[in-house]
């Protein structure tokens, strides 16, 4: 009985709880539906089509006087029926305007303000766009550029340009302009109108006026700079000699005070040939680096350091990260013939090696006014390697064009218009001479850019028909750090026993009709006991192992060096390093290339056999070499061994005091650059109109013999 009462009691309580929960749910449902309806009404009021045809008198009159009426803005393009909106037109605004209508009017006011601001921004952007377009002239936009990383440099350049433009507003320039022809008078009626414009608009109009009427002169500069170079600042070059143009005239009419112009003029003198400092600043008479100082540009990292950081992108088939390690020397190799300092060096890493050697150069200066030459630490070969086999030629040119723009805007460039600058490329010159009319051809256009043609370019192979390209030795496997290592290796080469008369390491070139490699390999096979042949056929790994290659050269008295895909071979320097006398078949393989590093008397260190005689079967290589007297062979070998230091690159960490009296290929190349720049400087100071007084196709002849008279080698260098 007690249990039944207890059960009935709990049942009654349960129903109470259930009923209360149900009532609470109904209340919440009602509140939710009411809130949703309110939100829906507000959303409908905020729709654009529901706020368009509102009467003007219901909008608070708190706009600025110069703003346009709201009804003109919102009713131009859209017409929507707003009859369903709860708006009362006849009721007084202060008494009958609903809360929703106030929200709508506030929104309309906000939209109107936003429209006015956008209109002002649009007008400003159009004016600025026209001004920038006028400054660019007719230059076509570049398809690919690395502008993001050069943004800081661009801002600096704009400030420099502004200073240089203001410099031309000095009183002296005013007087010079008064003597100019009357082609400026066409703009006199425009000047009073410009005086009425505010300062900002005056600056914009001045920029437009100083560039747009100057199309003819800017076209000349752009044509000289290969059309797709950015040459809007080409007038700052050292060669500027044309009369002043409309650009300077308009600037002289602005409201800048003459006193300010005089101060700026003294601080930034215009770059004219007569006033430019061609010679470096004098130092003390007993300065050991006098005339040898070199300044190294601090170019943006994307032109060198970032290429090494992203080394995995340089080649699809080769691990360039490994090959660019150890200052560009590559992986360390075991000692050879008891001498240390051997590395698996790739022939295309010369740029990295040279850069690291320059960091240790004894006459490197941070003061560009002392420098006799300026080094540009750009890695053009590695940069090109990334896109060499790609389908987009413009990507091969992008970084080079950006660098040229950066150089043109530097103060060091303006001193001699870049003629005291030099750069190193670890590839042959043919990789950098793609012509504009053949965009799909191999390589890029670096060597034909106007700026580079003013510079001195160091490559592992130069063109015989080029003013500014000079060849330097290929990197070898030996990079000693001390004087003792050099002497030890030379002594080892003098004592070594050489079993074979001559040897050849290479592959045939059946696709090249004028190649003599097949004939050479046939003659070597015929001289079984006197010739050693290492045929680099497909799949053979011996030709890629430094120790195997050096063993071949160490066992031979003469090493054959016929041309391959190009005139030169890295094998030439590997064989000389091994004390093997080189045998050349074309003067372009060494004699007309490495004019700074090899002796003028070619018979002292090499043998020359005309390739035509080999091709036609008129000569036996074995007979020619066997007839050389033994005493002469010893003398030639001694000369080759003495050449070894000049044809290799010391370890970049080595100091000049560590290597003693020896000069390596780097030292010889820098001396050659300094001598060439000094010659150009003298010709400029003498007022020579032409820097070179001989045709460019005879460059090889002038560099080798000092004249362009007829020579027996002329048939070898007939232009193709």
Curated annotation (Swiss-Prot):
Carbohydrate-modified residues: 82, 214, 237, 254-255, 438, 454
Biased composition (Basic and acidic residues): 114-124, 148-162, 171-197, 230-245
Lumenal compartment spans: 35-720
Membrane topology qualifier: Single-pass type II membrane protein
Organs and tissues of expression: Expressed in roots, hypocotyls, cotyledons, leaves, stems and sepals.
Enzyme Commission no: 2.4.1.-
Pfam families reported for this sequence: Exostosin_GT47
Coiled coil: none
Ranges of biased composition (kind: Basic residues): 132-146
Keywords, sorted A to Z: Glycoprotein, Glycosyltransferase, Golgi apparatus, Membrane, Signal-anchor, Transferase, Transmembrane, Transmembrane helix
CC annotations in GO: Golgi apparatus; Golgi membrane
Cytoplasmic side: 1-13
Keyword Heme appears in the UniProt entry: no
Places the protein is found: Golgi apparatus membrane
Function: Functions in xyloglucan synthesis by adding side chains to the xylosylated glucan backbone. Involved in the galactosylation of hemicellulose xyloglucan.
UniProt record similarity statement: Belongs to the glycosyltransferase 47 family.
Protein name: Probable xyloglucan galactosyltransferase GT11
């Amino acid at each position: 009985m007690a249990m039944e009462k207890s059960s009935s009691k709990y049942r009654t309580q349960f129903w109470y709880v259930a009923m209360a929960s149900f009532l609470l749910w109904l209340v919440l449902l009602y509140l939710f539906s009411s809130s949703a309806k309110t939100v829906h009404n507000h959303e409908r009021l905020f729709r654009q089509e529901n706020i368009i045809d509102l009467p003007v008198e219901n909008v608070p009159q708190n706009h600025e006087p110069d703003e346009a009426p709201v009804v003109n803005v919102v009713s131009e393009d859209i017409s929507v029926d707003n009859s369903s909106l709860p708006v009362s037109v006849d009721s007084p605004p202060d008494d009958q305007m609903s809360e929703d209508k106030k929200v709508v009017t506030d929104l309309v006011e906000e939209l109107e303000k936003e429209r006015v601001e956008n209109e002002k921004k649009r007008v400003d952007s159009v004016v600025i766009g026209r001004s920038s377009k006028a400054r660019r002239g007719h230059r076509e936009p570049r398809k690919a550029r690395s502008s993001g990383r050069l943004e800081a440099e661009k801002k600096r350049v704009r400030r420099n340009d502004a200073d240089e433009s203001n410099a031309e507003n000095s009183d002296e320039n005013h007087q010079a302009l008064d003597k100019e022809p009357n082609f400026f008078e066409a703009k006199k009626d425009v000047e009073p109108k410009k005086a009425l414009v505010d300062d900002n608009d005056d600056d914009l109009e001045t920029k437009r006026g100083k560039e747009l009427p100057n199309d003819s002169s800017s076209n000349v500069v752009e044509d000289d700079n290969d059309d797709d170079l950015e040459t809007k600042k080409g007038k700052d070059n050292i060669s500027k000699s044309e009369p002043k143009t409309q650009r300077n005239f308009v600037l002289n009419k602005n409201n800048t005070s003459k006193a300010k112009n005089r101060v700026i003029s003294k601080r930034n003198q215009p770059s004219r040939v007569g006033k430019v400092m061609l010679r470096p600043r004098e130092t003390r008479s007993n300065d050991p680096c006098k005339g040898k100082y070199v300044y190294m540009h601090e170019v943006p990292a994307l032109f060198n350091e970032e290429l090494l950081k992203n080394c995995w992108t340089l080649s699809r088939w080769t691990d360039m990260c490994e090959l660019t390690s150890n200052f560009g020397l590559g992986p360390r190799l075991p000692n050879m013939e008891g001498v240390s300092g051997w590395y698996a060096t790739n022939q295309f890493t010369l740029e990295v090696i040279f850069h690291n050697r320059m960091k240790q150069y004894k006459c490197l200066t941070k003061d560009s006014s002392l420098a006799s030459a300026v080094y540009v630490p750009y890695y053009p070969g590695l940069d090109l390697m990334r896109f060499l086999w790609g389908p987009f030629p413009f990507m091969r040119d992008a970084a080079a064009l950006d660098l040229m723009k950066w150089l043109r805007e530097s103060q060091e460039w303006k001193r001699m218009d870049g003629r005291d600058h030099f750069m190193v490329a670890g590839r042959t010159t043919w990789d950098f001479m793609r012509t504009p009319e053949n965009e799909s051809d191999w390589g890029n256009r670096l060597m034909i850019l106007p700026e580079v043609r003013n510079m001195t370019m160091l490559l592992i192979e130069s063109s015989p028909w080029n003013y500014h390209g000079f060849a330097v030795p290929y990197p070898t496997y030996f990079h000693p750090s001390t004087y003792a290592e050099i002497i030890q290796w030379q002594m080892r080469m003098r004592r070594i026993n050489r079993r074979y008369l001559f040897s050849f390491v290479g592959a045939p070139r059946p696709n090249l009709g004028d190649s003599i490699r097949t004939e050479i390999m046939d003659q070597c096979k015929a001289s079984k006991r006197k010739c050693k042949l290492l045929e680099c056929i497909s799949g053979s790994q011996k030709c890629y192992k430094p120790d195997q290659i050096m063993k071949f050269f160490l066992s031979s008295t003469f090493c054959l060096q016929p041309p391959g895909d190009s005139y030169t071979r890295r094998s030439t320097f590997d064989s000389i390093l091994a004390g093997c006398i080189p045998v050349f078949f074309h003067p372009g393989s060494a004699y007309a290339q490495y004019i700074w590093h090899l002796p003028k008397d070619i018979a002292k260190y090499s043998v020359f056999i005309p390739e035509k005689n080999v091709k036609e079967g008129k000569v036996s290589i074995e007979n020619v070499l066997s007839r050389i007297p033994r005493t002469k062979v010893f003398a030639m070998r001694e000369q080759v061994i003495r050449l070894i230091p000049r044809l290799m690159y010391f370890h970049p960490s080595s100091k000049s005091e560590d290597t003693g009296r020896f000069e390596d290929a780097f030292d010889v190349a820098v001396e050659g650059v300094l001598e060439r720049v000094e010659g150009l400087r003298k010709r400029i100071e003498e007022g020579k109109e032409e820097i070179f007084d001989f045709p460019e196709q005879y460059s090889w002849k002038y560099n080798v013999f000092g004249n362009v008279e007829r020579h027996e080698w002329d048939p070898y260098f007939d232009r193709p």
